[in-house]
């Protein structure tokens, strides 16, 4: 099994807010992330969702929607030169979102949805499939294979190098631990890395689903601890949601890190990787 650290050309860093709140808010976060984006040791992507389609409550803020959201992400791309990640929830969104996004992400709840995986894989974007909280990490190989066979029908089995070449990644974001809690089984990083590059989502891994009366809560203080552990195990990159004012974020504020906290964490993770 692969136990060494980064296999991708550079460690990947995916950072940004959970959901697009406004263009002004995106800019304020993007500016704060410039030191990380300019770090030549990192392959940086700015992330934000145009629609949070799986919010706990109907009343919760979802985002500006596909058209307006992509316009704002394109503005960030043009103004800052950042590569972009966004997630899609329905097949028809894939080809449109791929005109802006360099990575299209499949949400954890939808990680087995064949039509969605196929639609995303038919674009030129990197495919980042989040492991469902309910999934055996070994079974994520079948989601990877759906994407790989869409891109190259001759592929018969998933493997790390094949997935890397074809731009198919997996993302660990914790597993259900009873009701309203998640736990990270670090073995899953090594298991999934047998058949794809693996990104560790440090902030959603500390989420407490549905733990705040109609919305999810969490404890961001544990995110750096889990991220440093993941770096020691061996991963290809870090996913971390960040906000200049997490307490007033419109989604997942309890899990988010401030940009300066993320910068310190990434410094620690790079030091850990250098030990191996």
Swiss-Prot record:
Its EC top class is transferase
One Pfam family linked to the record? DAHP_synth_1
Q: Mind naming one GO cellular-component term on file for this protein?
A: cytoplasm
Q: Which UniProt key words apply to this protein?
A: Cytoplasm, Lipopolysaccharide biosynthesis, Transferase
Q: Does the keyword Cytoplasm apply?
A: yes
Query: Which GO molecular function terms does the record list?
Result: 3-deoxy-8-phosphooctulonate synthase activity
Q: Which reaction does it catalyse?
A: D-arabinose 5-phosphate + phosphoenolpyruvate + H2O = 3-deoxy-alpha-D-manno-2-octulosonate-8-phosphate + phosphate
This enzyme's EC code(s): 2.5.1.55
Q: Does the keyword Cytoplasm apply?
A: yes
Subcellular localization? Cytoplasm
State the superkingdom: Bacteria
Which HAMAP family does the record associate with it? KDO8P_synth
**Family indicated by similarity:** Belongs to the KdsA family.
Q: What is this protein called?
A: 2-dehydro-3-deoxyphosphooctonate aldolase
State the species of origin.
Helicobacter pylori (strain P12)
Q: Encoded by which gene?
A: kdsA
């Amino acid at each position: 099994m692969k136990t060494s650290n980064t296999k991708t050309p550079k460690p990947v860093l995916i950072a940004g807010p959970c959901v697009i709140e406004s263009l002004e808010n995106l800019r304020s976060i993007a500016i704060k992330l410039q030191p990380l984006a300019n770090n030549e040791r990192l392959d940086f992507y700015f992330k934000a969702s145009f629609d949070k389609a799986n919010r706990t409550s109907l009343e919760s803020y979802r985002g500006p929607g596909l058209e307006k959201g992509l316009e704002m992400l394109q503005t960030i791309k043009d103004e800052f030169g950042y590569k972009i990640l966004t997630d899609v929830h329905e097949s028809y969104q894939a080809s449109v979102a791929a005109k802006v996004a360099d990575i299209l992400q499949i949400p954890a709840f939808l990680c087995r949805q064949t039509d969605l995986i196929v639609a995303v894989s038919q674009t030129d974007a990197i495919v980042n499939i989040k492991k469902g909280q309910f999934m055996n990490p070994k079974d994520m190989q079948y989601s990877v294979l759906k994407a790989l066979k869409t891109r190259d029908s001759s592929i018969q089995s998933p493997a790390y190098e094949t997935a890397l070449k074809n731009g198919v990644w997996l993302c660990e974001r914790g597993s259900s631990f009873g009701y309203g809690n998640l736990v990270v089984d670090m073995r899953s990083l090594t298991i999934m890395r047998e058949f794809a590059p693996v990104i560790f989502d440090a902030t959603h891994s500390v989420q407490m689903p549905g733990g705040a009366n109609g919305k999810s809560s969490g404890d961001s203080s544990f995110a750096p601890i889990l991220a440093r552990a993941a770096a020691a195990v061996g991963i290809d990159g870090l996913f971390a949601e960040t906000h200049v004012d997490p307490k007033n974020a419109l989604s997942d504020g309890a899990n988010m890190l401030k940009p300066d906290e993320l910068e310190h964490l990434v410094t620690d993770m790079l030091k850990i990787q250098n030990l191996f």
